[in-house]
UniProtKB/Swiss-Prot annotation:
Signal sequence range: none
Family of the protein in this entry: Belongs to the asfivirus MGF 360 family.
Biological role: Plays a role in virus cell tropism, and may be required for efficient virus replication in macrophages.
Swiss-Prot/TrEMBL GO biological process terms: taxis
Keywords: ANK repeat
InterPro entries tied to this protein: ASFV_MGF360 (IPR002595)
ANK repeats by residue range: 61-93
Protein name: Protein MGF 360-3L
Domain of life: Viruses
Pfam families on file: ASFV_360
Amino acid sequence: MQPSTLQALAKRALATQHVSKDDYYILERCGLWWHEAPISIYIDNDNQIMIRTLCFKEGIKLNTALVLAVKENNEDLIMLFTEWGANINYGLLFINNEHTRNLCRKLGAKEELETSEILRFFFETKCKITSSNVILCHELFSNNPFLQNVNMVDLRMIIYWELKDLTTNSMLNEISFSEMLTKYWYGIAVKYNLKEAIQYFCQEYRHFDEWRLICALSFNNVFDLHEICNTTKVHMSINKMMELACMRDNNFLTIYYCFALGANANRAMLISVKNFCIENMFFCMDLGANVIEHSKTLADIYGYSIIVNILSLKIYKANPILLSKETNPEKINTLLKNYYSKNMLAYDIYCIDNYL
């Protein structure tokens, strides 16, 4: 028998209250208990109900909590979360037995989801960027048999787009959908420096160590790059690492780290020019790169007239404060987090003096 609406409202009100540990038994008897701990709720900035438990201290969306309850075949919570407003149709993604399917039908679920609904749930679930949520998303999506049996071309395209800054996008064509999703969540963890999630993926997927390195370089995560270089055996040359760091503009932190480890600043400048990363190009000159004429020729070949014009000026030189080759990520971050290229400033001043 389903709880009445009044019961559901009462439980929702109780879940918003602070309850002392001595009274936890009340929450357990009321069904506000999950993973051996109490359930509490709060309303986020988007006026959405968030579920907080011992496992999800930062909170997860109500719909996400519902599908997790479906995956666990927790009937009481399936009914409770549905009465609180969760979309029971999303439960279809994670049903693993007929009894739970019948319960979802009774609660109003249809027989199957449209691709658009799957994508909507994917976006709703992943939007909270925390370690616990990224790990949860991986567990929900990466090895989901349901997703293996539907056409997920649209989702693949979304993942390609979000990882467009990585130079190895073509690698994603050669792997299974499950492996692609795993790499995607790992990449998100590195991009936002989610340390608990990074450690989770590092321990569970040792064979993805190079992927972690690629993500750290491409997403300008000097902290994780330093961790990788000091705790694992890196099977990539320092100049190849610099090449990856230079593929995305304004990647000063990881470019500098590679430079400090001995990467060639001239080579980095040429790569930056080739990829039309103008801020990186200026930064490489700050680091002492002096292949001006070679870079001009390369820019001319690619039709980058603005770079040709920039490099036609004889006003560029190294910035002495960058030549100490510091490898402490905290110090690098302090040095460069608000850094404006000395050579870009020289170019700006030249333009002001000559065109105003």
